[in-house]
């Protein structure tokens, strides 16, 4: 629905947002048109999975299969065809400033198969559009000291996306001074609009019966792997070599009701991550970000 999408993106613009990431699939032409009209930059993301898959019936089933579409080129895999057509379709939209070839890809470990895959996907994009950065959202940098075979994958990219990896940023920045690093997915604070709980505490994955399936709108609830909105933004603000962040998420969505995710008894069906709820009404962190990003 064009009007609903316009309202949603306009609300992000009013909060002070200057860019959005399409997680974890290509955007509709209407979304990109609205973003261009509003002056929002877009990182357009092609895949949430490569050949390893994440669910039994996800795109991983087709990633390396030969493309059978009548417009597919000889020798193209489905991942080649889908990525190429996304870039061809949207390369003339002025809102698009980065292409993403994946999000939290478990098999992107720098071994021969994954290294060949990242090179193949980058080439597919560059053959169509050499003017924009190619990136991906990587969560492996958050484990241990952040090092590993995934660094080889990052070397093939124009911009290196860190998912929840702020704690290892300084070590990796010193190790890779030439990398363009940004937060491809950050925060994952959890909130219920109008519900308030223990403001003096920072609550990590708090899901006891006393919570009544609600998270605190004080901005003090978060997942184990994330940060509060305040801490996430403060890190971004205070590290000049960190090129901004994409917050998880702008609006609530159906599914992933963390911290009650995968608990079959839960009556909750939507996420708590959104800065705006499913009715389109802002939660309190909306005004935190607005106070930092908008001049009034």
Say what each PLM segment does.
Residues 1-296:
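Extended substrate-binding grooves/exosites of carbohydrate-active enzymes
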């Amino acid at each position: 629905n064009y009007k609903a999408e316009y309202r949603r993106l306009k609300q992000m613009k009013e909060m002070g947002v200057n860019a959005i990431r399409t997680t974890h699939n290509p955007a509709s032409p209407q979304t990109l048109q609205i973003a261009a009209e509003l002056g929002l930059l877009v990182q357009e993301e092609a895949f949430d999975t490569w050949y390893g898959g994440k669910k039994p019936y996800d795109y991983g089933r087709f990633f390396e299969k030969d493309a059978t579409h009548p417009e597919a080129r000889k020798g193209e895999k489905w991942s080649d065809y889908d990525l190429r057509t996304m870039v061809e379709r949207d390369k003339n939209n002025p809102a698009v400033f980065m292409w993403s070839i994946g999000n939290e890809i478990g098999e992107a470990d720098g071994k021969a198969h994954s290294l060949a895959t990242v090179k193949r996907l980058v080439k597919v994009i560059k053959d169509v559009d050499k003017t924009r950065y190619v990136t991906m959202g990587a969560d492996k940098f958050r484990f241990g000291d952040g090092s590993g075979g995934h660094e080889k994958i990052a070397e093939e990219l124009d911009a290196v996306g860190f998912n929840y990896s702020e704690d290892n940023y300084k070590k990796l920045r010193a190790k890779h001074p030439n990398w363009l690093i940004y937060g491809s997915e950050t925060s994952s604070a959890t909130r219920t609009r109008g519900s308030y709980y223990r403001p003096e505490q920072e609550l990590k994955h708090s899901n006891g019966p006393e919570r009544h399936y609600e998270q605190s709108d004080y901005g003090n609830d978060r997942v184990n792997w994330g940060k509060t909105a305040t801490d996430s933004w403060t890190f971004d603000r205070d590290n000049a070599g960190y090129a901004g962040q994409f917050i998880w998420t702008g609006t609530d969505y159906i599914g992933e009701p963390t911290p009650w995710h995968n608990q079959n008894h839960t009556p909750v069906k939507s996420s708590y991550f959104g800065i705006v709820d499913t009715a389109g009404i802002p939660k309190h962190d909306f005004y935190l970000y607005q106070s930092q990003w908008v001049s009034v």
